[in-house]
C-alpha cells in the first residue's frame, strides 16, 4: 500500500461517506470507490461497510485508520521540525458540540482560530446529539460528562450551571412560584424526552421530580428563545441567560451543575490540527470562565 492510497482511505474514514470524501479530495466518487475496493483487495481485508447513507469502518478499517493517522502525525511533526511551508497547520477539523455551547459561545469565536491558522478548515456541528468519534462523525466533541467507554482522550473543559428562568412578561402575567412544588401550576418548557441522548441532559428532573413539560423543544437555544417569548418557565444554561434583561430568575437558590468535556479518538492524539483546536477551546473558555458557573443565591 502506498501513501496515496492511505491518504484516500483516511479521507473516507473521516468523512464517513464516499461522496463527501470525493468532494473534499476533488476526485470522482466512482473513482474513489474503485480505489477503495482495490485497496481492500490488495490487503486481503474488508475495511469499509458500505451503506446507503455512508460508510462504517470495520475492525480492520479502524486499525488501518489508526496506523495511518499515527504516520500522518509523525509526518506533520517532521515537517514542523524542519520548517518551511509544511510547518503551517492545515487540513480540516470537525468539532461537534451541544447547540447551546456551539451556537452561542463557540461559533462567534471561530474567526480567531481561523486567523491564527489560515490553512485550517474548521467545521462546527452544533446539534443536540451524541457524536460517534470512532465513526468519524466529529474529530473533536464537546460532551456533557466524561465518556466511560471507547478508545478516547478526554479532558475537562469547564463546569457550567443551569437555573430556572421566565420572561418578565410571563412573571407579570402569571407570577412566580415560591417553591419547586409551586411549579405544578405553571406552564413548563423542557426537552423532548425521548430525544434526550444522555442521562446527564435530563436537567428538569434535577429541579423537580414532578416536572411535566407542556412545551418540548429538543434544542437549548430553542428553549431559550421560547422562554424569552413568554412560553413558560424553563431550565436554561446560565451562560446563555446572562445579560438578557427580558429574563428573570425563578427560585434563584436552586442551581444544577454539569461539566463539558473535550473528547477525541486516541488515534488523533498528536495531530497538529487537533492540538490547535483543543488548545483554542480551552483558551476561549478560560478567558471567560466566570460566565459559566453561577453560585446559588439562597
Predicted segments — roles?
Residues 11-26:
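Short helix-boundary/capping micro-motifs
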Residues 23, 41, 115:
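Alpha-helical residues within the helix-turn-helix
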Residues 28, 35-38, 109:
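Residues within the DNA-recognition helix of helix-turn-helix
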Residues 39-40, 247:
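Conserved amphipathic alpha-helical core elements
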Residues 40-57:
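A short LG(V/I)-centered, amphipathic sequence patch enriched
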Residues 52-55, 59-62, 73-96, 295:
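Short helix-loop hinge/linker segments at domain boundaries
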Residues 90-150:
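Central regulatory/effector-binding core of bacterial HTH transcription factors
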Amino acid at each position: 500500500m502506498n501513501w496515496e492510497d492511505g491518504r484516500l482511505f483516511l479521507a473516507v474514514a473521516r468523512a464517513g461517506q464516499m461522496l463527501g470524501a470525493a468532494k473534499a479530495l476533488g476526485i470522482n466518487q466512482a473513482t474513489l470507490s474503485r480505489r477503495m475496493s482495490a485497496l481492500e483487495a490488495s490487503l486481503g481485508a474488508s475495511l469499509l461497510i458500505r451503506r446507503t447513507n455512508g460508510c462504517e469502518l470495520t475492525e480492520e478499517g479502524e486499525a488501518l485508520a489508526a496506523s495511518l493517522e499515527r504516520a500522518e502525525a509523525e509526518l506533520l511533526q517532521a515537517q514542523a521540525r524542519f520548517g518551511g511551508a509544511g510547518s503551517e497547520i492545515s487540513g480540516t477539523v470537525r468539532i461537534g458540540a451541544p447547540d447551546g455551547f456551539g451556537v452561542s459561545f463557540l461559533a462567534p469565536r471561530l474567526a480567531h482560530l481561523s486567523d491564527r491558522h489560515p490553512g485550517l478548515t474548521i467545521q462546527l456541528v452544533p446539534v443536540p446529539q451524541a457524536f460517534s468519534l470512532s465513526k468519524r462523525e466529529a474529530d473533536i466533541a464537546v460532551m456533557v460528562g466524561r465518556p466511560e467507554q471507547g478508545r478516547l482522550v478526554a479532558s475537562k473543559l469547564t463546569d457550567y450551571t443551569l437555573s430556572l428562568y421566565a420572561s418578565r412578561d410571563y412573571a407579570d402575567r402569571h407570577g412566580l412560584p415560591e417553591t419547586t412544588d409551586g411549579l405544578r401550576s405553571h406552564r413548563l418548557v423542557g426537552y423532548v424526552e425521548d430525544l434526550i441522548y444522555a442521562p446527564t441532559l435530563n436537567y428538569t428532573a434535577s429541579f423537580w421530580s414532578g416536572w411535566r413539560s407542556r412545551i418540548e423543544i429538543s434544542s437549548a437555544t430553542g428553549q431559550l428563545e421560547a422562554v424569552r417569548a413568554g412560553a413558560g418557565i424553563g431550565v436554561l444554561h446560565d451562560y446563555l441567560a446572562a445579560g438578557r434583561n427580558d429574563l428573570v430568575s425563578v427560585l434563584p437558590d436552586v442551581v444544577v451543575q454539569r461539566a463539558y468535556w473535550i473528547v477525541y479518538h486516541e488515534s488523533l492524539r498528536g495531530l497538529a490540527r487537533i492540538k490547535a483546536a483543543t488548545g483554542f477551546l480551552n483558551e476561549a473558555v478560560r478567558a471567560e470562565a466566570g460566565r459559566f458557573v453561577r453560585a446559588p443565591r439562597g
